[in-house]
Regions:
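Non-catalytic helical/linker scaffolds that mediate oligomerization, partner binding
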Residues: 1-295
Length: 296
C-alpha cells in the first residue's frame, strides 16, 4: 500500500505577506538626482516597477533623455519596467510675492487681484485669471498644501478680500486649493495636450490626468492617445471633491486610478481622508482597475 503523500506545511503569514507585496508595485518619481543611468539601475535593482515622469517640471527633451535611459537599463537588466507620464493639469498657483515670502498673520486681510505680479504683501495674484470671478463670499482658500487657510469675506468685480483663518508662511508659486469651488478651467491645457502627444509618440505605458472631475475628461485623453497609435492606459488622479462625487463613473472610464493624497487631503476634510482613500480603493477593486496610493 503506497504511503500517503506528505501534507504541505501551512504557509506562514510572512510568506503570504511576501506574495501580496509581489502583487503590489512600486512607483518612483524621477528627479534631477535620479536621472543618471547609474541611479536608474540602482532603483530598478532595488525593486522599482514604474518610473513617473512629472511633466510639471523639466522640458520634453529632458524627459525624453530620461525615458531613453530607463528603457536602456530595463533592457540591460532584462527586467521590464513601465513609464508613467504625469500631466501637470490645471494647478492654480500664486504668482510672485514681494521678496518671495509673506507671513500670513491670523486675522489679517489678504486680497486676491487680477494681474501677473504684485508689489504688496497683502495683495496676491495667481496664474488663473478667472479666480476672482469664480470665488464667492464664504469660500475657503487653502494655500501651500493647506497649511495656510483664508475665507472670502467680500468681493468686487476686480478683487476678492479674504481673512486669514490659519496663519503661516507662504512663498511664491505655491499651490492654491479651493475646496468645493467648481472651476471653469479645462482639465487639460494646451501644454498638457502637447505633453500627451509626446507621451504617445515616446511609447509611455501610462499617462495620468491631474484634477479629474468627470469621466468625459478621461475619455478625451484616451481618444487622443488612441488616435496617435498609443495603447497607454489613462490613470485618473482623484484629487478633487467632484472626482469623489463621480468616482464610479471615473473608475469605469479609466485604465487605473491614483489616490493623490496631497491635493485630495486639502480638498476634503483631513479627518475623513482615510475613509475616502479606502472607498476609492474598494471601488477600483470592484471594477478590477489598478490603483496607486501616492504622496503625503
Amino acid at each position: 500500500m503506497p504511503s500517503p503523500a506528505p501534507l504541505s506545511a501551512p504557509r506562514s503569514p510572512i510568506s503570504r505577506e511576501a506574495d501580496a507585496f509581489v502583487r503590489t508595485k512600486i512607483v518612483a518619481t524621477m528627479g534631477p538626482a535620479s536621472r543618471t543611468e547609474e541611479a536608474i539601475r540602482g532603483l530598478v535593482e532595488a525593486g522599482v516597477d514604474v518610473f513617473r515622469l512629472n511633466m510639471a517640471h523639466g522640458s520634453i527633451p529632458e524627459h525624453e533623455e530620461t525615458l531613453g535611459r530607463i528603457r536602456s537599463v530595463s533592457a540591460e537588466l532584462e527586467r521590464p519596467v513601465a513609464v508613467l507620464v504625469d500631466l501637470a493639469g490645471p494647478k492654480i498657483r500664486l504668482g510672485e510675492l514681494p521678496d518671495g515670502l509673506v507671513e500670513c498673520v491670523e486675522g489679517a486681510e489678504i486680497t486676491f487681484v487680477r494681474g501677473e505680479e504684485s508689489d504688496r504683501a497683502d495683495r496676491f495674484v495667481t496664474n488663473y485669471p478667472p479666480l476672482v470671478d469664480e470665488l464667492a463670499v464664504g469660500d475657503a482658500v487653502m494655500i501651500a498644501d493647506g497649511t495656510v487657510s483664508l475665507v472670502v469675506e467680500s468681493k468686487t468685480s476686480d478683487e476678492a478680500r479674504c481673512r486669514v483663518v490659519q496663519p503661516g508662511p507662504i512663498r511664491s508659486r505655491q499651490g492654491v486649493n479651493l475646496p468645493g469651488v467648481k472651476l471653469s478651467v479645462p482639465a487639460m491645457s494646451q501644454t498638457d495636450w502637447q505633453h500627451a502627444e509626446w507621451a504617445a509618440a515616446a511609447g509611455a505605458d501610462f499617462v495620468s490626468l491631474s484634477f479629474v472631475r468627470s469621466p468625459v475628461e478621461v475619455t478625451l485623453l484616451e481618444q487622443l492617445l488612441r488616435t496617435r497609435g498609443s495603447r497607454a492606459r489613462v490613470i485618473a488622479k482623484i484629487e478633487k471633491r467632484e472626482a469623489v462625487d463621480n468616482l464610479e463613473a471615473i473608475v469605469e472610464a479609466a485604465g487605473g486610478v491614483m489616490v493623490a493624497r496631497g491635493d485630495l487631503g486639502v480638498e476634503t476634510d483631513v479627518a475623513s481622508m482615510p475613509m475616502v482613500q479606502k472607498r476609492i480603493i474598494r471601488v477600483c477593486q470592484q471594477f478590477q482597475k489598478p490603483v496607486i496610493v501616492a504622496t503625503q
